[in-house]
């Protein structure tokens, strides 16, 4: 078990501990539960879906990287597939505050990058900030997405974001978590192809500036992130943050990164290179390359 989970795990009910122990035994537990695992945990712990999600929130919050605020927020995105995806906030010392990943963004991008097609609910241990409410409004679940908070009745995103502005106001039909493939040809080595594949998945209906990042760890594991734009612009999630989020959720540290590649168009309206390189260098990675999409 990764050390970050030990305190939260010890506070769980005995029957839930017994059911979770084999799942968490892997040091690189992927911070997600399959639909089958969720069903098993519900039956073993004798909890309904909402109660189980609340019980697991401390494990999600344990994934937080909060070197600046020391305020851990955890979230669980519940996919329409039945799979659950952990998320937690991430802060990057030496970078800028704008590079921060919020817990809801973490869980949602986690689900998206693993191929989830839509979300039914998000469970989070603190009220979503305005930034996250706007980020969630980009999803194909729209304002019907259920938000679950401890000690409160569940509400929809519509309740938390009245008079919402979103992609429909800009006549955008393809939403975040809808399947997208921009068709860029895969070239180069495995890591380069992974970055291009991530760029092909980008959600960028406002700038038309696709980008993807691939990070290779010292053990050969590769994590990718795709660019996810937002109708309000500022809640947009850069591709590097998506990749770093997956890397961290899987129990890796920034020191494990040995190489990084950004894929983007050289003549795009928005360029990720400077911000990507600066953040990676702040985290100790200097082997950074860029491939231009044709």
Swiss-Prot record:
> Which GO BP terms sit in this record?
cytidine deamination
Give the matching Pfam families.
Answer: dCMP_cyt_deam_1 (PF00383), dCMP_cyt_deam_2 (PF08211)
Indicate the segments forming the CMP/dCMP-type deaminase domain, all copies.
Answer: 48-168, 186-294
Q: Which CDD domains match?
A: cytidine_deaminase
Name the domain of life.
Bacteria
Which chemical reaction does it catalyze?
cytidine + H2O + H(+) = uridine + NH4(+); 2'-deoxycytidine + H2O + H(+) = 2'-deoxyuridine + NH4(+)
Q: What is its EC number?
A: 3.5.4.5
Query: What positions belong to coiled-coil segments?
Result: none
Question: PROSITE patterns attached here?
Answer: CYT_DCMP_DEAMINASES_1, CYT_DCMP_DEAMINASES_2
Gene Ontology MF annotations:
cytidine deaminase activity; identical protein binding; zinc ion binding
- The positions annotated for binding Zn(2+) are 102, 129, 132
Note how many cofactor molecules are bound and how. Binds 1 zinc ion.
Q: Which cofactor does it need?
A: Zn(2+)
Annotated Gene Ontology cellular components are: cytosol
Q: Where does substrate bind?
A: 89-91
**Active site annotated at which positions?**
104
This protein's UniProt keywords: Hydrolase, Metal-binding, Zinc
**Family classification:** Belongs to the cytidine and deoxycytidylate deaminase family.
Task: State the HAMAP family in the record.
Answer: Cyt_deam (MF_01558)
- Describe its function: This enzyme scavenges exogenous and endogenous cytidine and 2'-deoxycytidine for UMP synthesis.
Record text on subunit structure and interactions: Homodimer.
Q: Which NCBIfam families match?
A: cyt_deam_dimer, PRK09027.1
Name of this chain's protein: Cytidine deaminase
Taxonomic lineage per UniProt? Bacteria, Pseudomonadati, Pseudomonadota, Gammaproteobacteria, Enterobacterales
Q: Which gene holds the coding sequence for this protein?
A: cdd
